[in-house]
Amino acid sequence: MKFNYDVIVIGGGHAGCEAAAAAANMGAKTCLVTIDMNKIGQMSCNPAIGGIAKGQIVRETDALGGQMGLITDATAIQFRMLNKGKGPAVWSPRAQCDRGKYIWKWRETLDAIPNLDIWQDQADELLVSDHEAIGVKTVWGISLYAKSIVVSAGTFLNGLMHIGRHQYPGGRCAEPAVAHFSESISKWGISVARMKTGTPVRIDKRSIHLDEMEEQPGETDFHQFSYMGTPRQLRQLPCWLCYTNKDVHDTLRSGLADSPLYNGQIKSTGPRYCPSIETKLVTFPDKDQHPLFLEPEGENTNEMYLNGFSSSMPMEIQLEAIRKIPAFRDAKTYRPGYAIEYDYFAPTLLDHTLESKIIRGLFLAGQVNGTTGYEEAAGQGLVAGINAALRCGGGNERFVMNRDESYIGVLIDDLTSKGVDEPYRMFTSRAEYRILLRQDDADARLTEKAYRLGVAKRDRYDWWLQKKEWIHRILQVCDNTPVKPADINPYLENIGTAPLRMGCKITDLIGRPQLSIQGLTPILPALREITDQLPNRKEEIMEAAEIQIKYKGYIERERIVADKMHRLENIKIKGRFDYNSLKEISTEGRQKLTKINPETLAQASRIPGVSPSDINVLLVLLGR
């Protein structure tokens, strides 16, 4: 049988779901192919969304019209804003979610999108004609044809799972691996390699002595992931904190000979920033304890996730070690932790739309590009889905985000310019324009662009316009309203900050670290009048305005730096040079430029091994 579509998406994980939703919402006739329709959007590891830098990616995905933020808000059982003790450039939202409800909310969301079909099957072969992807053949013998193909297969491509010395093919616990699909891509010259990840044991809550652990409740303020204001619907639950000890470590060390990480079974590279418990012991032998966070898997389940205890040790060693922790002395488990090795493709062979440079019409997103994390996958999936749909339109429009526009832009630029030799995880430190990429202003950066593309809907765009207008009004009031010392000094003295010696504007007061719009509103009539007019989401608008006031100088300074770099971004160099013939450029520079074939001079400047003098040579050759 044969079926025709505009876009086919392979894999129903976080990248695939966002890709399929984006393409279909833009009007492309789309088919999502997944092994199990009942596990769409499955959180394969921890039941949480967001975190440092990851939360910003979710906010950006939401601002672009993606679904992850909405679904997270609807299924959250705990919310926290991380890094709140630091500046707003690094504030990062994070939520625990109900794993089962998260899956069904994704299914409900996809089922409601016109133009989107879901097909339960397994991709077996990428169909290619004249270096252009034209379709997919499945293990059931079905042929699906399309103008654009998005591959977002997660850990399923030649997945191999490890528990102690036991190993078996699988893409996830009790799910099959995809055996031949990688080869149908790599045979066209796309480099394939292996990576490893892992997950911890799941524990029965009824067997845990929670009263012997430190409870960690969530927060109840106004912050959310979606700018659309989805109310929290589920019962909010705490997490718990405890620590490993010497007895735990001794037990784990006794089993290292059977650990696939240390007995030679696993040869691929795992995530540096999410190491297994056995890796922690080997890397930090002098540490007497490591923190463990017990996280609920859902509102109505006893299954608990033990964050910090990822392991592929034999099951009996895992259980014996866990029971050496006082709170887990009677622990019962649902399933062991395990490691999994899987295929990924060299992301330097993609352009910034995530389309392959070798096979036209083939887009890759998520862990198949060497990243780790639901959020990184979702951001890539959204970009791939948008560009897959644009390609079907027959025009030359491309959706690409710069490094000063989004963390997603930073992520994709890092992947395509630098490549990966270990699973890539986003951090705020990877972004050079952090003050421009805050979690509070992703809508300001991205929503209008997404609306014009057709991926963000009118209600989202209208809300952004309303929010923008109210922020502007508050800033005008603050910039233009004078304050007399007699009106404000009693309040300033009461909170322990210096009184005014002369009059000033409200903006000058808010610039002080101790003062806020919310705190000044009851005292200053002009501020109270404008904030009382806010129709909804008052706290969100006030916070956004306050951040713009307090960090105005930093924002303007960073924008100047970013604009200077834009000049290099605008200098297109792809296809203009035979780098091997440019002897003025260093040998390493010629090799890297030839391999990556950067699109712009700015991208070339970020390639490891390309020196500033190499860039100057290119500038001279371009007559700049």
What would you call each of these model-derived segments?
Residues 10, 143-154:
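Short hydrophobic core segments
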Residues 305-371, 400-413, 538-592, 597:
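A glycine-rich dinucleotide-binding beta-alpha-beta segment and adjacent secondary-structure elements
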Residues 430, 436, 447-616, 620-624:
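Extended, charge-enriched "interface" segments that sit outside catalytic cores
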